[in-house]
Amino acid sequence: MLTGTHLLQLHNGFHLFTRTVGHGPVKLLCVHGGPGSNHTEFENFAAELGEDQVQVSMYDQLGSFYSDQPDYTQPENRQYLSLDYYLSELEEVRQQLGLEDFYLLGHSWGGLLAQEYALKYGQHLKGLIIMSMIDNIAEYAPHVNALRQQTLSTSQVDYMKGIEKAEAFDDPEYRHLVDVLNAHFVCRHPENGPRQLVSTLATPVYNYFQGNNEFVMVGALNGWDQRKNLHQITVPTLLTFGEYDTMPLNVGRRMQQTLPHARLTLTPD
């Protein structure tokens, strides 16, 4: 496999940004979260894991960062706002990168895609890594609501609910409260993460699937649930969560028991 940065042309004509670093025998493909985030969260993985041990590939999904960004208001592009599309995109990336018997890592939304991929294309995998993602949305929504109630005052929570009902998400006080929650549960140490001068989130993609923010789950992912199929993922699987995570750890522990070959780790702070 070629290392470095490349643009892949998909069968649909769009281009995706990809980067491959390292020359080790272990192959790792990383799938970013969001939806609508980007590859930069993985840029130090090869150096930290050892470039002579692991070859790390990453890419920006359609609509994100360096990849093509369709105008989703156009009817012909609405078909690309679907879970099925992003799953097929992941498989096409694998094919074009020539990956076989590889490890797949998915963070957040990428962890959702990784589960879907393991269920449909598991024959290509050597192992699976799911970072901060559970196997359904139904148990996510009440958990983030509980986190909000634990962190903010009753009046602040009521204020946020009122803004959400009115869909006035640009309200300055509301944005401030979202920032407070994000600092507790989404990005506790921004100094350790990628730094961009401007926001790089693909908001049309994020808003469609998620909603306005991590604490409002009103998007197309509502209803996603693989609890009944999770046991069919038979490759060795690492589940990893943060001590302060928007995903409920008790569900992660249940997943560990359900998956035939799984291990769970917890990252403090």
Residue ranges and their predicted role:
Residues 58-109:
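Active-site loop/oxyanion-hole signature of alpha/beta-hydrolase fold enzymes
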Residues 100-143:
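Conserved hydrolase catalytic core segment
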Residues 127-168:
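Flexible "cap/lid" loop of the alpha/beta hydrolase fold
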Residues 164-220, 229:
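Conserved alpha/beta-hydrolase catalytic His-Asp/Glu region
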Residues 233, 239-241:
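Short beta-strand/loop motif that positions the catalytic acidic residue
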Residues 246-251:
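Conserved alpha/beta-hydrolase "acid-adjacent" motif
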Residues 252-269:
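Catalytic histidine neighborhood in serine/cysteine hydrolases
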